[in-house]
């Protein structure tokens, strides 16, 4: 190589600067964040007076676990909005908050107990609540530092927490509005129930996953028609929940469906249908149903049509009718009637009804005034059959780990033994699961506390409607601006079709339903619920100082009722509120009550993902309209 190599760098007129070649962000970013904290950047931005305010109300994340990418996206989007409004000259307020009560935290504490061989039900409730509070406090601190590391500007030294004493007081006060305005009631209806967590769940606490389920085609014997052609024929139902068969009380058919009577004239081996057996089926589904029983089209024939008049004469026997050692559990005649929810798109054209485990069936017999005849209480809170149920007592629908229990197998085996099955199989379908335990849920009839969404609200505030539903729908159209506009349609359709709000949960970590019921009265009696402003005021005063723990302390009932009514005449309710009621009440204890909330108690913006149309948007709308 020649010694005369040209140094081209020396021939260039390069600018010189004191700026470092690399930004050094890993080192510099923490320094900037520390500087912002030292000077109190959020409060300094508030110092300028007489500016138009802008309030973004933060939907609270759950105080459980470290941040994930969804948290980051959510908070960064909010930070962009707040900073933009600030740079446009507004007083842009952002108070971060956390959802601190509820099942996910209880579940973590119970996991700790299980590892130690400790039974949660044997732990004093105040001790359990203390552990839940400490767990939530720990995760609030961790998540706060993680959010600050993302550079999010907000009131981090004084966020809102749903477990703060003042927050719990306000949540109780908001609940008392429902108590006093007549929309709160105790009812018994099928709700989504988690046997693993032993509590009712809201729709927003459920997620859908594929699940493989047992599926059975079951025969009900026809009696009482006086028609030799129909008597002793079998009506066939199809279900993916064999565990509901012991609770069957009826079968329903469709008023507009064409039905026929089909006779078996041949059969293969290992077939549960017998030659000469006759089945009533929807014509559109008959070939498929009989095919499930391994009968090809040469092995059965259609004898005749079965008219609506014919169906109206039919009575049915449960497949376990008269079974030995059944103790008469299934020996009464099963109701048989038309229902508008029956179709012939799948199944058999008939639907088996266990009104304790299906909302449509429950509503059908409620409207008929026949609930007392059809409601059963066969399934306990842990998903096991009551101990004295013949054949199936103590059998579990689900194991404690959420896997398939032994109930379905035992029922299928018994139905096979008595000749009650036409066919069986398995099906993979979308099925509701608890979002926390990931275990399947069931529908179970239990006494719960509800907010009636269609009952007139007795508060004299009818500008936007008389009922919670009417007010919510009017507010969606007249008081809220939607971006994108499709968000309006999503929430409107959900609220338009939703049932009454299940407020109660059978858990311990949350704000209790601060109410009392009168001994000897029925839920339908006017005096069943104690509605007393002086009692309510005592409760709220205690919650402000001691938090919701005051409800669980010894002598609480006498403390709140003594000198006003006779404590011995009332029972204290210990269910806790749905955590969505907690977060739905944040407008009251953040926007309304805090000096740095908003002047009019309203937010300029709620910014969340579309999942909150059935979550926080939904509960905030319902709660504020009650």
Listing of model-derived features with the role each one plays in the protein:
Residues 2-18, 22-25, 31, 35-39, ...:
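Residue patterns forming the tRNA-binding/recognition surfaces of aminoacyl-tRNA synthetases
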Residues 22-52, 290-296, 305-306:
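Histidine-rich, glycine-flanked metal-binding segment
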Residues 42-44, 297-305, 315-318, 420-426, ...:
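Short secondary-structure junctions
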Residues 60, 98-102, 383:
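Acidic, glycine-rich active-site loops and adjacent beta-strand->loop/helix elements
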Residues 62-96, 107, 111-114, 192-197, ...:
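Conserved active-site neighborhood of enzyme catalytic/cofactor-binding cores
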Residues 93-95, 100-103, 174-180:
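Hydrophobic or amphipathic alpha-helical targeting/insertion segments
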Residues 250, 257-350, 359, 363:
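Protease-associated
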